[in-house]
Amino acid sequence: MTSITHDQRPSKLVPPHGSAELKPLLLNGEARNQALKLASTLPAITLSSRERGDLIMFGIGGFTPLNGFMNQADWQGVVDNMRLQSGDNAGLFWPIPITLSAPKATADSLNQGDKVALVAQDGEIMGILTVEETYTIDKEHECQQVFTTTDPEHPGVQQVLEQGEVNIAGSVEVLSEGEFPTLYPEIYKTPAETRAILDNKGWQTVAAFQTRNPMHRSHEYLAKIAIEICDGVLIHSLLGALKPGDIPADVRQEAIKTLIDNYFRADTVIQAGYPLDMRYAGPREALLHAVFRQNYGCSHLIVGRDHAGVGDYYGAFDAQTIFDHVGKDDLITQPLKIGWTFWCNACNAMASDKTCPHEASEHVKVSGTKLRKALSEDLDVPENFSRPEVLQILRDYYAGIAFDERAEVKLVGASAV
């Protein structure tokens, strides 16, 4: 099925994952008003920050073709084999479980077919879930399979270990996109809105650049490599929760906009954002990034060093090699794999391990962690780390934080090289 844009030109973009069309679950108008009235009378489950972001992605169609939080069969299939196991989506590739949890006492009070309100931690009613089943899981097994570790210091593992004792499965109706549309009006875009922008540009091949950091020179280099290959690049910023020490989304938005305005052709790049929290699942999260970027209309995902990683839990390029084990029939969006990138003093330019003939002593390897560490400790930042306009924005941000209130930034794993 070929989708049609508002001006009736057929779309050249990749189709959504596992579906001919997007499947947003967000209610609007009178249907939303009636659902809100109903929700106010229902028992409630309070969402974690991660679950809230997942629910919003259901709402906007970012998790097409899923219709709600996974049941036990799907949880097991995804954790062990990265495949859904039930319903119309049985056999579909999906790399990370999308689940809702609750305390045992809450779960024990629920029966199949019951409706429960899904409420954010600030009290906002976010949605309604119709209970399919409740089930317990082996949390350590999920962590080992998804994160390759059960270390409670890993932020993603910590989220799983701290979630409720019982998972609640069921279809959802989404009633709110939270603060994202008003807090980030310039860059927060639904998959349908993003596809409309890409279609209006006439793009067919689009590379997504996933970022949770302001863009330094290596990021800029990766994006420009992708522009040479594809019609354009979607710089797609995570707008949900991060770990302590990461730079807030509003600062990143300003820094990225400044970089685009000064160093990119305007007709080759789009800045946008999406509402998820980071899971820091490394290779598995890279696959999830590809799945939902397909829903946003992207044919490719830029996968560089330590994509979606944290600390030293993953090898520098594990997030690239995992794609080698995924069939092309399972995932249309393909990785653009790019190796080590760095500033070379001898080349006097950005380069990569494929293009530069010079010794490692000439290379300045740039990472977001190194940049954050230098800025948070008021150290000098080499001029080849980041563009001066971007650096000024970041310095202004750190100047507003008392030195003893800044989170410690540690160099470990690939970021320490």
From Swiss-Prot:
Record carries keyword Transferase: yes
Reactions performed catalytically: sulfate + ATP + H(+) = adenosine 5'-phosphosulfate + diphosphate
GO biological process, one term: sulfate assimilation
Keywords, alphabetical: ATP-binding, Nucleotide-binding, Nucleotidyltransferase, Transferase
EC number of this enzyme: 2.7.7.4
InterPro entries listed in its UniProt record: ATP-Sase_PUA-like_dom, PUA-like_sf, Rossmann-like_a/b/a_fold, SO4_adenylyltransferase_pro, Sulfurylase_cat_dom, Sulphate_adenylyltransferase
A Pfam family hit: PUA_2
Domain of life according to the entry: Bacteria
Claim: Transferase is one of the keywords in the record: yes
Molecular function, one GO term: ATP binding
EC top class, as a word: transferase
Pathway(s) served: Sulfur metabolism; hydrogen sulfide biosynthesis; sulfite from sulfate: step 1/3
HAMAP family the UniProt entry points to: Sulf_adenylyltr
Family to which the UniProt record says this protein belongs: Belongs to the sulfate adenylyltransferase family.
Listed name of the protein: Sulfate adenylyltransferase
